[in-house]
């Protein structure tokens, strides 16, 4: 029995209907932007393996930091103990995040980072004697697959089986020039009820919705309205964080700053599962009391794992180099050049670019399912051509590692152009 057959026998893959799925390629090696399967076939990782790998596969700098930490202190419980990597990582995050972010709580992935934020927001008001248990989120948002995060997500078939078992979440449209006045008024009426603990958002880019982009000015206004009504704001930067939007964080485009931020994915350069939720001093002070019952009773076995912290410190060190910042801008310029080239294609409805993110929407007669026929044909076409792209319905997006070469980007662009001719 080969590896592919064993995979089918034993493994349950995410977002997969196994009865109809084709066997998955067995990846055996990664280097830079390239991956190889067991047959020797080469793939360009055009989406940074679900947006986690900005510095390339098998990055020696991060790997060495991990090895050094593994042979010094691989893990120690964070309840009742602390350690240098966590202290240094929190110090570094305080330096690069918005200045109001003062305290850091570590967890395991993006979903758990969101769960922490929700629990903190609700308990903050509980500690003050207020009952605020509702959340506001954007339509078509995606915040993760655990129960709280899933409740705030807007992709209906992800949550259909769990109706009645989720947090109460009210969704508002993403603001556009056409609807922003109505959105602001609806939002204001909601927060004035004093029923809401928090407003959560993916700043500037809704990733799983198809890289839907919106203006920072509109988000600034929503944050201002939230603050005026004592509703916490949670920036879910799990996808956008660590350079993807052209700045270190999407919140760097904002005048107003969130009360909490959720970070994961690229935090460790795609090496070790880890996440962090950051908080303003005001939020932390809501738990700082003589009463033990007002403490945050939440934790994970691998909270602030030293090896993960070491990987994150190395990853942030790479991000802040001038070379990597230049790489991000270079990818952005190449995306913009491709946008000019492709947007006149009669099969293309819209295009959009921010930082290293490129997306195009294909013209279709009928609305396409998230995992519909067109998407599946496009995905199979790209895999056949050695390109890892995962279209969302009729939207094709690129989010490559920052170290990608021009020749690899051109192969991706050419594959998209070819797909528009052959798959459409």
Please give the residue ranges for each predicted region.
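Conserved N-terminal phosphate-binding loop of PLP-dependent enzymes in the Aspartate aminotransferase
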Residues: 1-424
């Amino acid at each position: 029995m080969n590896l592919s057959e064993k995979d089918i026998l034993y493994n349950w893959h995410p977002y997969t209907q196994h009865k109809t799925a084709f066997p998955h390629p067995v990846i055996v090696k990664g280097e830079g932007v390239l991956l190889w399967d067991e047959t020797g076939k080469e793939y360009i990782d055009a989406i940074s393996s679900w947006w986690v790998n900005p510095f390339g596969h098998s990055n020696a700098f991060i790997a060495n930091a991990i090895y050094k930490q593994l042979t010094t202190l691989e893990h120690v419980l964070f309840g009742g103990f602390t350690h240098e990597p966590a202290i240094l990582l929190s110090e570094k995050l305080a330096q690069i995040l918005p200045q109001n972010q003062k305290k850091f709580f570590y967890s395991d992935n993006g979903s758990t980072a969101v769960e922490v934020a929700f629990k903190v927001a609700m308990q903050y008001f509980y500690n003050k004697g207020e009952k605020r248990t509702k959340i506001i989120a954007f339509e078509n948002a995606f915040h993760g697959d655990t129960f709280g995060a899933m409740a705030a997500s807007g992709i209906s078939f992800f949550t259909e089986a769990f109706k009645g078992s989720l947090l109460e979440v009210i969704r508002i449209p993403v603001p556009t020039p056409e609807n922003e006045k109505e959105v602001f008024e609806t939002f204001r009426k909601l927060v004035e009820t004093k029923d809401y603990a928090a407003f959560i958002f993916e700043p500037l880019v809704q990733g799983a919705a198809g890289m839907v982009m919106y203006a920072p000015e509109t988000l600034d206004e929503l944050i201002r309205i939230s603050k005026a009504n004592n509703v916490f704001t949670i920036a879910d930067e799990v996808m956008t964080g660590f350079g993807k939007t052209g700045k270190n964080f999407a919140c760097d485009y904002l005048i107003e700053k969130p009360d909490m931020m959720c970070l994961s994915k690229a935090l460790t350069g795609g090496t070790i599962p880890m996440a962090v939720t950051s908080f303003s001093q005001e939020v932390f002070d809501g738990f700082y009391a003589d009463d033990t019952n007002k403490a945050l009773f939440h934790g994970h076995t691998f909270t602030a794992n030293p090896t993960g912290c070491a990987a994150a410190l190395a990853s942030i060190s790479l991000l802040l180099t001038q070379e990597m910042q230049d790489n991000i801008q270079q990818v952005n310029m190449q995306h913009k050049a491709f946008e000019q080239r492709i947007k006149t294609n009669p099969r293309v409805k819209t295009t959009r670019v921010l930082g290293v993110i490129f997306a195009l929407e294909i013209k279709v007669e009928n609305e396409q399912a998230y995992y519909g026929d067109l998407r599946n044909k496009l995905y199979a076409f790209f895999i056949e051509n050695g390109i890892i792209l995962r279209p969302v319905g009729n939207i094709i997006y690129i989010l490559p590692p920052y170290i990608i070469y021009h020749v690899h980007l051109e192969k991706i662009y050419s594959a998209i152009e070819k797909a528009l001719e052959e798959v459409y």
